[in-house]
């Protein structure tokens, strides 16, 4: 009819179908990316250590936001720590987890425990870590336990010698884990064989793994 307006803005039926197909493709790609991100996150162990609310005084009053300290690991020697800040708690946790994955590092282990005693320090936090015999479990409390569990350490002795602040304890634990070296590295540095520098328990644990 002459006076009737076209609701599709003058587009033909073929153009409308093409646009519908493009929208479905775009939505499918977004769904694929979302599913891929969920799969990647499900592969890791996440632990939220602390959530704090912080406020900022502005002209109109106070603005509140949240910070989250998150530990992420694969349970097989890889672990990282992240700190996220956002206006909502879930967003802060997500940002912390993303930063933790960017900060991944590998922890040298033999038979489910660390390779040698070490002491980590960060600010006022001091954490002592010692290898333990199989079956001991993770003897750790407070904020150090999530770091060790996410790294996949099964047997270890730890003790906090400094501040009880969770952030300091976490970073002191990470500092200690980063100081660990493999027996092969020590042997190469000293110009000796692994059997000459490694304790007997390390050699037994390695033999058990290879068997």
Curated annotation (Swiss-Prot):
InterPro entries: Ribosomal_Su5_D2-typ_SF, Ribosomal_uS5, Ribosomal_uS5_bac-type, Ribosomal_uS5_C, Ribosomal_uS5_N, Ribosomal_uS5_N_CS, Ribsml_uS5_D2-typ_fold_subgr. Residues 1-41 are annotated as: Disordered. It comes from the Bacteria. One of its GO terms (molecular function) is rRNA binding. One of its GO terms (biological process) is translation. Keywords: Ribonucleoprotein, Ribosomal protein, RNA-binding, rRNA-binding. Residues 44-107 form the S5 DRBM domain. It holds the Pfam family Ribosomal_S5_C. The keyword Transcription does not apply. GO terms for cellular component: small ribosomal subunit. SUPFAM superfamilies: dsRNA-binding domain-like, Ribosomal protein S5 domain 2-like. Signal peptide: none annotated. With S4 and S12 plays an important role in translational accuracy. Located at the back of the 30S subunit body where it stabilizes the conformation of the head with respect to the body. Belongs to the universal ribosomal protein uS5 family. The N-terminal domain interacts with the head of the 30S subunit; the C-terminal domain interacts with the body and contacts protein S4. The interaction surface between S4 and S5 is involved in control of translational fidelity. This is Small ribosomal subunit protein uS5. It comes from Corynebacterium efficiens (strain DSM 44549 / YS-314 / AJ 12310 / JCM 11189 / NBRC 100395). The gene is rpsE.
């Amino acid at each position: 009819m002459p006076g009737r307006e076209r609701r599709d803005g003058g587009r033909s039926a073929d153009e409308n179908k093409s646009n519908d197909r493009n929208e479905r493709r775009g939505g499918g790609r977004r769904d694929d990316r979302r599913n891929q991100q969920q799969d990647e996150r499900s592969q890791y162990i996440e632990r939220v250590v602390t959530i704090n609310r912080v406020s900022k005084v502005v002209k109109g009053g106070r603005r509140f936001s949240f910070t989250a300290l998150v530990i992420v690991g694969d349970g097989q020697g890889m672990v990282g720590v992240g700190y996220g800040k956002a206006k909502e708690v879930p967003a802060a946790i997500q940002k912390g987890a993303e930063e933790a994955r960017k900060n991944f590092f590998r922890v040298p282990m033999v038979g489910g425990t660390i390779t040698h005693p070490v002491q980590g320090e960060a600010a006022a936090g001091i954490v002592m870590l010692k290898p333990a015999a199989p079956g001991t479990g993770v003897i750790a409390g407070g904020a150090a336990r999530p770091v060790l569990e996410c790294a996949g350490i099964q047997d270890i002795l730890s003790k906090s010698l400094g501040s009880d602040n969770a952030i300091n304890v976490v970073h002191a634990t990470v500092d200690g884990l980063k100081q660990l070296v493999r027996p092969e590295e020590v042997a190469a540095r000293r110009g000796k064989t692994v059997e000459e520098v490694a304790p007997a328990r390390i050699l037994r644990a390695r033999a058990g793994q290879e068997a």
